Amino acid sequence: MYLIEPPFFVLATQNPIEQEGTYPLPEAQLDRFMFELRVDYPSREDEERIVNETTSDETATISPVLSAAELLQLQHLVRRLPAPPTVVRYAVQLARSTRPLDPEASADVKRYVSWGAGPRASQYLVMGAKARAAMDGRAAPDIDDVRSVALSVLRHRVVVNFQAEADGVEVERLLSLAERPARG
């Protein structure tokens, strides 16, 4: 056993096109990642800079942006922000609305989803909303903060069934449908 000093977190990459040579993570392990972020191709200028920096003999210079202590302070700051009951209620309702057996799930979620987001999704919706509010200089998150992080928090937690794949229904569409009941 190794003691890992805080702050400790894991970043992982996954190539959405080619899975050969990689081992897909089971849903239970994917659920431990707070966000799934999609990264688009870089701009022409950024790609040229990447090529120049990675094909030369020069060693890249990396400068820290934050110390470990500063990062821990920011993490504690986010946790100290209060989440209003309306935000917690919305996050829980949104996560629950992705579950096909939940009475408030939409007909499409019931038809196309095999497995919806679990309680960890509700936690991460609130934590993501708190972080967004903190970055924006606000003392507490609101429902719009939850909405802004919802796709990144939920996308990798919702498993569609064969019918969804056959009908060309993607997770992103189902999440927009799942959000509708929670808005009321």
Short names for language-model regions:
Residues 50-51, 91, 149-154:
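Short alpha-helical scaffolding segments that buttress acidic/His motifs in well-ordered protein cores
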